[in-house]
Design a protein with these regions (language model features):
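Membrane-embedded alpha-helical signal segments
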Residues: 1-184
Length: 184
């Protein structure tokens, strides 16, 4: 590995980690303008009719925070349009986009043999968390006591380290209704 490729890798990671903060409204508007010139129907009727530019910016930032590619702006807008009649909450709309892109996202993390290395929750814990789901300011969250929350955080951290030390991206595979709350 030469020093140029190491530098390139570090710069790429740096940009990825700060991408949500770098994505401002002007950039989002320019992206939408480019899409509108190619595919007007993708944008018209969605922004600002269904959601505002700043709400869409929040959705894109949420996706970038989780390293979800936002290249398919037309597809993202379609998912947002299909779900904006139910909610305008950026976290929930970003989650709908993630779920729609599940196949694409999983392909990003498969190894050379096509295997996806993940860890999962114990069925009893999954059940307990499912029954503790409740609404929060960020959309949805778990309403569990502090000791259980800390135990979950500790065990999750351990499992993430195991995967990372094995050279894999640490991924938790859980039911979609738990994912957003677990992420937050």
């Amino acid at each position: 590995v030469n020093s140029l490729s190491v530098l390139s890798t570090h710069l790429t990671e740096l940009v990825r980690s700060y991408a949500p903060d770098l994505l401002n409204r002007q950039m989002v508007q320019e992206m939408l303008n480019q899409l509108k010139s190619r595919s007007p129907a993708s944008v018209e009727g969605v922004i600002p009719e269904m959601i505002s530019l700043s709400e869409f910016q929040s959705i894109l930032r949420n996706l970038l925070r989780e390293r979800v590619p936002i290249r398919d702006l037309s597809g993202i807008l379609e998912v947002v349009a299909n779900n904006a009649t139910i909610t305008r909450h950026p976290n929930i709309l970003a989650e709908a986009v993630r779920q729609t892109m599940a196949h694409t996202l999983s392909s990003l993390y498969r190894d050379d043999t096509g295997t996806l290395h993940v860890f999962t929750l114990a069925p009893q814990l999954e059940s307990a968390l499912r029954s503790s789901l409740g609404a929060t300011d960020s959309g949805v969250g778990f309403q569990v006591d502090a000791s259980l929350a800390q135990a979950i955080i500790n065990k999750t951290g351990e499992q993430m380290e195991v995967l990372a030390h094995s050279g894999y991206m640490p991924l938790l595979l859980c039911p979609r209704e738990l994912r957003l709350a677990f992420r937050r």
